[in-house]
Amino acid sequence: MEKYHYFTKDGYINTVFRIPGPKGTVEGLGAQGKPVVLYQHGLFDCFAGIINDEEDSLGLRLVNQGFDLWMGNARCNRYSRDHQWLEVDTSKSEVRAKYWEVSFDQMAEFDQPALWEFILNQTK
């Protein structure tokens, strides 16, 4: 599994994980040209639920069928807890509050376009 960070226009640093091929293959090699799938988790979740069971996981089944799987993480979850200019772990409550002021609108406006642009640049 590969781990990448991408930046949003409003400063969040989010994480995306990639599984370009089945277990035991050299990661990153041969992924170019494969069909890309972005699997985005739902509300109050993270990417881990996508690949939690090797036998029944849709994500791993897609990888085994030849897809280049990318798993997005929403801002402010355990895998995407960074920001370019706001400190997450600060004693200043006004700074911490600003970091946590997030909405689905922001995720749609900033996170998804940045994520798609990142994936498209990586898979050209």
List each model region and its residues.
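Short, hydrophobic/aromatic-rich segments at coil-to-beta transitions
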Residues: 1-4
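Intrinsic-disorder/low-complexity, polar/charged segments
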Residues: 7, 19-21, 92
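Intrinsic disorder
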Residues: 7, 34, 53, 98, ...
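Glycine-centered tight beta-turn/hairpin loop motif at sheet-sheet or coil-to-beta transitions
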Residues: 9-11
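Short, surface-exposed "cap/lid" segments of acyl-processing enzymes
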Residues: 15, 20-88
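Alpha/beta-hydrolase active-site loop
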Residues: 90-123
